[in-house]
A protein has these predicted regions:
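Peripheral, non-catalytic segments flanking oxidoreductase cores
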Residues: 1-346
Length: 346
């Protein structure tokens, strides 16, 4: 469980913008990340070593989901086989909003542009985790910019996991094998506006991420909330020039319990008198090891990443038909608040 924080810390990555950062600067940065991941599990990262700006990132969302973006028919041509049985893609591509589900979003996902396609990747699973990306036929520039953004975030993740290793008392190369045939996912998300007639405040139910690291670009609309140890939901609005980093369940396991994967959700934008409900865009990047990567914790536990991922996917709505019931281990916000109140009493 996280500590009793009231806001997210801010960590500057200015040291990573240097062509040759000093060992002392890198050690200090690793120490900051250790503190963050031991307490909040979330932080803002500023002074980013990226060429893509905030506007560049959300222009991709607007070109895909916006008023002048793709029609629903065009998006469904890219939909996963779960939603369009005649389509070939099972893991990458588009997923539509699910009627009746609390997670009100649609998304477009792509993987590592250079990932090796494995003929045995599916095994006994219906999902091919190393399949090629799918893109709309035009414009070609959209493909290129998505791939470039993915590459930049993958490179930043590689720098961060090197620091993570140092923070855990390991050599900086300890996680280098995670980068081989990485399955990292870039996800463009659109949370449509919710009609006032629909009494729903949560647009993404409380959860932790399942993998290693998540890097999140969020727009100015906001809505991200992070849960502290008291069960309070702490708003994490957009900070100019920042992205948000958080660790997933797997990195918490790798740390031997030293670090925490913190619950978070997203709420609808605040209601304003006479103002139309507003949607939002969000662009998370999930840093993931390769399909056959053996992920080992510092206390000796091991798991094959592909097996871990396939197990987690069973509970993700975008890989289920609309008729599939939600898993019992997904708690509503009300359920979580009740649980936390009982914990306090006990």
């Amino acid at each position: 469980m996280s500590t009793s924080f009231s806001s997210l810390p801010i960590v500057s990555l200015a040291a990573l913008k240097s062509f040759s950062p000093s060992p002392d600067d890198l050690k200090a940065l690793a120490s900051q990340l250790n503190e963050v991941f031991s307490t909040t599990g979330f932080a803002y990262l500023t002074d980013l070593p990226l060429t893509y700006t905030h506007d560049d990132v959300f222009r991709l969302c607007d070109e895909f989901f916006g008023p002048n973006g793709l029609s629903m028919d065009e998006k469904m041509k890219l939909a996963k086989k779960t939603f369009v049985p005649t389509n070939c893609n099972t893991y990458r591509g588009y997923f539509p909003p699910q009627e009746g589900d609390d997670n009100l979003k649609e998304g477009f996902e792509l993987g590592t542009p250079t990932s090796r396609h494995s003929e045995s990747a599916m095994g006994t699973s219906e999902f091919d985790l190393t399949e090629p990306n799918v893109f709309p036929p035009s414009p070609e520039e959209f493909h290129t910019r998505c791939k470039t953004l993915h590459n930049e975030l993958q490179n930043l993740s590689a720098q961060l996991v090197s620091l993570v290793a140092v923070a855990l008392g390991k050599p900086s190369s300890f996680f280098s094998h995670y980068l081989e045939d990485s399955l990292s996912t870039l996800r463009l998300l659109h949370y449509p506006p919710i009609p006032e007639s629909r009494q729903q405040e949560i647009v993404c139910t409380p959860h932790t991420d399942s993998g290693i690291l998540t890097l999140l670009h969020q727009d100015e609309t906001g809505g991200l909330e992070v849960e502290n140890c008291k069960g309070d939901w702490i708003p994490a609005p957009y900070v100019l020039g920042s992205i948000v980093v958080n660790i997933g369940d797997l990195l918490a396991r790798v740390s031997g319990g030293r670090w925490i994967a913190t619950y978070y959700d997203r709420v609808r934008s605040s209601k304003k008198q006479g103002v139309e409900p507003k949607g939002r865009y969000s662009v998370p990047f999930f840093f993931e090891p390769g399909l056959e990567c053996v992920v080992q914790s510092i206390d000796g536990g091991k798991v094959v990443y592909g097996e871990h991922l396939l197990g987690k996917m069973k509970g993700w709505v975008e890989f289920q038909n609309a008729s599939v019931a939600r898993p019992n281990d997904v708690l509503s916000r009300a359920d979580r608040e009740l649980r936390n109140s009982l914990v306090e009493v006990l």
